[in-house]
Every structure is written in structure tokens, then in C-alpha cells.
């Protein structure tokens, strides 16, 4: 049967009314729920909480701190790696010479180095090294010098206790105390030994052969003979005043 226009309108109106009723009921239910919440929490304003949870913030902060620590640790490690360790002894090269060794097949060339080592606090030593390359010869000389250290007396933290002469082969050396502020008066080879021993004011004089290695050995012979006044008094069974 064909449907009248009136019936069709009535049908649509019914559907719209039912839909409106369902909407109204759902809205009233939601309003009631919100009112209950407001009654329970009067401070609650019904705003949407956009701030993150405490757990999430703490996690993020921990992650940031961890990353920052990682960076700082790596930076500190790099800084420490770049830092050079402080050396106990200072080194000075006195002489480097090219040496030939004649063998059956011909000549063999090598390098010889003389190095002085000291801590500027009363310990000093010298060494001799020989190798096919200059760096290797210097390393050997440094090791030899560290194995041949001697301790020397220093008066007033600046000079030798008394005048001393020494001789090695054709080289002769004199060491003499100097007043404070005078400085080191010496040749290059003698200065290397005296500075690294810890003397800051001293007179020196060298005679005879100018061979650098022989002069260094003569200086070491003179340093070995140096004594404190107390030691000399004990050896002679005397008071320091009687010397």
C-alpha cells in the first residue's frame, strides 16, 4: 500500500522525538555524574588536566640527568686522557754524536747520547745510550741515568756547602758556593748537571779538555765529594764550632 505524506511525517517526527529523548537522558546522566564529583571535590573546577604525571616527569628528569652525567663523565675522561702525567725527573740532553763501528763487511753507523736526569731536589744522574736511531739512544740514556742517581747536599736551598775540585781524564772542574741571587755561572754541560741537581746559585770553572761527556763525569766526581759540615764533624769527632 502506498504511504501517505502525513503518515511519513508522523513517522519521522516520532524518530526525531525518540532521538532527542535519548540525548536528553544521556546528558542528564552526565550532568548528574559531574555534580556528584563536584560535591565530593569542591576545589575541582572541571578543567582538563594537561600536565604530565609525576611518574613521567620523574622518568624524563632521570633520563636527562643520566644523559648529562654520561656527557660529563666522557668529558672528564677526555680531559684526563689529554693531561700528561707529571714526570718525577726532568731530562736534559748533553750530547748526541754519530758513531761508526768498523766490521769485516764495512762500517756500521749508530748514534750515542749522553743525558742528565734530575728532580731539582738533590737527586741527579747521568747516562749513556747507543742505538741505530736517535730517539732509541736517548731512551737508553735516560734509563741508564735513572739507574745511576746520586744524592747531593744543598745549603740554603741554593748552593754547595764548600769549594770542591775534581778531575776526569783531561777534564778538570771546580765548584764554589755563591751568595743568593748570583745565579748559575757555568758552561752548558756543567749547567745541565747543576740545574737538575737543584742548585740555583753557584760558581763553576772548567779546565783542560772540553769533551762534554768527560766534563759531566768530572762534575759528578766533584758532587760525590761534597759533604755537610755535620758529616765532616762526625768523621773527625769534632764539634761544628771547631771546624
Curated annotation (Swiss-Prot):
Coiled coil: none annotated. Keywords: Ribonucleoprotein, Ribosomal protein, RNA-binding, rRNA-binding. Pfam families: Ribosomal_S5 (PF00333), Ribosomal_S5_C (PF03719). GO terms for biological process: translation. Residues 89-152 form the S5 DRBM domain. Residues 1-21, 34-46 have a biased composition (Basic and acidic residues). One of its GO terms (cellular component) is small ribosomal subunit. The keyword RNA-binding applies. One of its GO terms (molecular function) is structural constituent of ribosome. InterPro entries: Ribosomal_Su5_D2-typ_SF, Ribosomal_uS5, Ribosomal_uS5_bac-type, Ribosomal_uS5_C, Ribosomal_uS5_N, Ribosomal_uS5_N_CS, Ribsml_uS5_D2-typ_fold_subgr. Residues 1-85 are annotated as: Disordered. HAMAP family: Ribosomal_uS5_B. The N-terminal domain interacts with the head of the 30S subunit; the C-terminal domain interacts with the body and contacts protein S4. The interaction surface between S4 and S5 is involved in control of translational fidelity. With S4 and S12 plays an important role in translational accuracy. Located at the back of the 30S subunit body where it stabilizes the conformation of the head with respect to the body. Part of the 30S ribosomal subunit. Contacts proteins S4 and S8. NCBIfam families: rpsE_bact. Belongs to the universal ribosomal protein uS5 family. This is Small ribosomal subunit protein uS5.
Amino acid at each position: 500500500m502506498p504511504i501517505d505524506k502525513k503518515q511519513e511525517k508522523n513517522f519521522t517526527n516520532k524518530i526525531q522525538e525518540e532521538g532527542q529523548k535519548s540525548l536528553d537522558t544521556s546528558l542528564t546522566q552526565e550532568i548528574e555524574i559531574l555534580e556528584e564529583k563536584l560535591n565530593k571535590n569542591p576545589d575541582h573546577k572541571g578543567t582538563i588536566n594537561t600536565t604530565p604525571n609525576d611518574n613521567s616527569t620523574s622518568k624524563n628528569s632521570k633520563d636527562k640527568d643520566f644523559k648529562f652525567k654520561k656527557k660529563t663523565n666522557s668529558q672528564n675522561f677526555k680531559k684526563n686522557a689529554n693531561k700528561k702525567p707529571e714526570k718525577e725527573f726532568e731530562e736534559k740532553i748533553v750530547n748526541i754524536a754519530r758513531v761508526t763501528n768498523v766490521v769485516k763487511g764495512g762500517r756500521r753507523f749508530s748514534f750515542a747520547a749522553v743525558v742528565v736526569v734530575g728532580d731539582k731536589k738533590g737527586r741527579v744522574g747521568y747516562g749513556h745510550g747507543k742505538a741505530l736511531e736517535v730517539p732509541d739512544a736517548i731512551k737508553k740514556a735516560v734509563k741508564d741515568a735513572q739507574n745511576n742517581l746520586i744524592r747531593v747536599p744543598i745549603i740554603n736551598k741554593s748552593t754547595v756547602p764548600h769549594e770542591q775540585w775534581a778531575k776526569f781524564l783531561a777534564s778538570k772542574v771546580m765548584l764554589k758556593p755563591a751568595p743568593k741571587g748570583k745565579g748559575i755561572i757555568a758552561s752548558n754541560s756543567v749547567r745541565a748537571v747543576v740545574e737538575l741537581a737543584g742548585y740555583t746559585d753557584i760558581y763553576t770553572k772548567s779546565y783542560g779538555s772540553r769533551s762534554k761527556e768527560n766534563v759531566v763525569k768530572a762534575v759528578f766526581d766533584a758532587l760525590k765529594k761534597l759533604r755537610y759540615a755535620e758529616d765532616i764533624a762526625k768523621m773527625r769527632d769534632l764539634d761544628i764550632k771547631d771546624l
